């Protein structure tokens, strides 16, 4: 075989080998990105569902340092109350209210903020307090032309919703708190931290699959996907949900922990509905009973059986029904 033929053979071999290598590399990179594509697709699907429920996203610049993102009802109906839904630590609002936005959008004009450092909401300011979160929510609502509303908050969102009622009594007509540790005593907080055995920031802002599994086990009472989900999926979930503004999210938790616990919460004037899962391992039902006693006679406590901390995810039908009857009903319903 002459040298020209040998060279053509070698060239063809190298070209074929390179093509196969590139194809294999492409397949591997695509396979590697499947978890990311999965969660991006889910996020897109959730946004489309919110739009299907008659909501649209909007972003409001509160000042040159703070931006807040909302989902709001497209067409306000004056025969419907306004309901502000405040999410907790489990990611942006679309992920947390997916089981509620459909039924509630048929009864209320909805305003759903992403709290600062979640979703597209952000602030360059150093304030990490629940008071600051509440003030930003109200400034955003006023920018949307909303002056009076009922507030509903879950977990961390319950802290913010309570501040809304405390700071803006003329704006907040009714209040719904779901599984939130407002008013827990120093003894209760110490007992819970000892039971959990980990710093709350390590759990509520997980950094690895084991942290996320612990968070799910604490939040849910009923069987869930936590046992079978592979590590690579959980890592991507953490990347999507928690790595954005990770430092700021941790600072929000640290602010709550640095505050001196006070079982005597500020008394508010609004009618208040407390909804609790009887199996809550984060904020036990005894906390709800203490809050109820302090807010009587203007509070009502509803305990949902066989439900954990994530009542909005585990028992959404019960939560939705209670919210609709309370907010739509008479002041003493």
Regions found by a protein language model. Give the residues of each.
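Alpha/beta-hydrolase fold catalytic core
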Residues: 1-83, 106-108, 328-333
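Short beta-strand/loop motif that positions the catalytic acidic residue
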Residues: 268, 274-276, 280
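Short alpha-helix in the alpha/beta-hydrolase fold that links the catalytic acid
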Residues: 270, 284-292
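Flexible "cap/lid" loop of the alpha/beta hydrolase fold
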Residues: 162, 166-167, 171-207
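Conserved acidic catalytic loop of the alpha/beta-hydrolase fold
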Residues: 131-149
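Conserved HGGG/HGGXW glycine-rich cap/lid loop of the alpha/beta-hydrolase fold
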Residues: 72-120
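Conserved alpha/beta-hydrolase catalytic His-Asp/Glu region
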Residues: 20, 36-37, 186-194, 203-267
């Amino acid at each position: 075989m002459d040298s020209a033929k040998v060279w053509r053979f070698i060239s063809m071999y190298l070209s074929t080998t390179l093509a196969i290598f590139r194809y294999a590399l492409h397949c591997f990179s695509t396979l590697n990105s499947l978890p990311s594509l999965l969660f991006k697709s889910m996020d897109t699907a959730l946004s489309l569902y919110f739009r299907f429920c008659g909501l649209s996203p909007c972003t409001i610049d509160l000042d040159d340092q703070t931006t807040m993102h909302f989902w709001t009802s497209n067409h306000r109906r004056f025969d419907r109350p306004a309901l502000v839904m405040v999410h907790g630590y489990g990611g942006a609002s679309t992920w947390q209210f997916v089981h509620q936005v459909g039924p509630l959008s048929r009864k209320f004009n909805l305003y759903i903020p992403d709290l600062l450092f979640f979703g597209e909401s952000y602030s360059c300011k150093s304030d990490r307090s629940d008071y600051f979160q509440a003030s930003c929510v109200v400034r955003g609502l006023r920018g949307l032309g909303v002056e009076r509303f009922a507030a509903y908050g879950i977990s961390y969102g319950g802290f913010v919703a309570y501040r809304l009622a405390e700071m803006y009594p003329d704006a907040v007509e009714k209040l719904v708190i779901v599984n939130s540790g407002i008013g827990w005593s120093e003894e209760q907080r110490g007992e819970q931290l000892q039971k959990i055995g980990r710093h709350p920031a390590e759990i509520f802002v997980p950094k690895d699959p084991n942290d996320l599994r612990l968070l799910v086990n604490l939040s849910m009472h009923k069987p869930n996907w936590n046992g079978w989900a592979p590590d690579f999926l959980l890592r991507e979930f953490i990347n999507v949900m928690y790595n954005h503004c990770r430092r700021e999210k941790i600072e929000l938790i640290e602010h709550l922990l640095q505050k001196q616990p006070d079982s005597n919460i500020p008394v508010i004037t609004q009618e208040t509905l407390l909804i609790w899962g009887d199996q809550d391992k984060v904020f036990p039902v005894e906390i709800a009973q203490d809050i109820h006693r302090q807010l009587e006679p203007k509070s009502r406590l509803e305990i949902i059986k066989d439900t954990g901390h994530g009542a909005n995810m585990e028992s959404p039908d019960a939560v939705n029904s209670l919210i609709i009857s309370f907010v739509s009903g008479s002041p003493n319903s």
